Amino acid sequence: METSLRRAAAPAGAVAERTVLRNGGAVRDAVAVEEPLEIRVDGDRLATTMRTPGADADLALGFLFAEGIIAGVEDVGTVIHCGRPGEEGYGNVMDVRSAAGMRIDPERILEGRRFVPVSAACGVCGRLSIDHLMERIHPLPAGEPVAPALVAAGMEILARSQPVFERTGGLHAAVLVGRDGAPIASAEDVGRHNAVDKVVGAALRAGRVGPRAAAGPAPALLAVSGRAGFEIVQKAAAAGVPVIASVSAPSSLAVDLARAAGVTLCGFVRGERMNVYANGERLGLTGP
């Protein structure tokens, strides 16, 4: 399967330099940037997440979609950075505004509201309850089979989509891949759940995800660096992505949710060698 993809360039503002001690001397070294992003809906502050700057609009859209606050881009009029140059926090506030004639349900916003800032490592911290999340997951249909070769191709694309990691060693990455093996969206972030929100948000804007997606085939695979936790499976299921591939292990709750949601969950992927923890029949396998 063809997996050629030009290596992506690092987004502006994603890399900083700091002085470090190395081999008895002081040198300048590249480090990944981590800054807060406040997400608002129609001016109402909803959440603050620690993220790496870049694709902030996609991050906000993907976050709201995964939370069930928006059903699709049809709900959204504009997504803008707030403030003026020189103001404290300029560029670190995104305001998602409702489309004309439509208002996002405030009660739905309150149901998804987080009581504490969202760290880069936690995609579900502060939510009212895990049970509330489970109630919003609808099992995916079996659909068409997916070739194991697509999983391997997705991981190759993932490896080519990490320019900031190559410079800093400090970021996670996610990529959405179509059934034809072509990349739909890729992103890096200090938080793995943020990287997933970014690619889902990009796919939403491109018309590839959502209830009215019609711009092209839906994503068939989400490939992620690091482990596959509960929040990764939840976000993939919300976006209708049938297969998740991770370079590392899933958690027990991720496996349980994947089985309940009809998502094929693959871990420790090395080429076409992998552990399949849930719904292996989609890959032509028998078992979990």
From Swiss-Prot:
Q: What is its main location?
A: cytoplasm
SUPFAM superfamilies linked to this entry: Cytidine deaminase-like
Active-site residues (renumbered): 122 (cysteine persulfide intermediate)
Please tell me where Mo-bis(molybdopterin guanine dinucleotide) binds in this chain: 268-273
Which Gene Ontology terms describe the biological processes this protein takes part in?
Answer: Mo-molybdopterin cofactor biosynthetic process
Pfam families annotated for this entry? FdhD-NarQ
Q: Tell me where in or outside the cell this protein is found.
A: Cytoplasm
Keywords associated with the record: Cytoplasm, Molybdenum cofactor biosynthesis
Q: Which GO terms describe its cellular component?
A: cytoplasm
Q: Name one GO molecular function term.
A: sulfur carrier activity
Q: Which family does it belong to?
A: Belongs to the FdhD family.
General function of this protein: Required for formate dehydrogenase (FDH) activity. Acts as a sulfur carrier protein that transfers sulfur from IscS to the molybdenum cofactor prior to its insertion into FDH.
Q: What is this protein called?
A: Sulfur carrier protein FdhD
Organism lineage reads as:
Bacteria, Pseudomonadati, Myxococcota, Myxococcia, Myxococcales
What gene is this protein a product of? fdhD
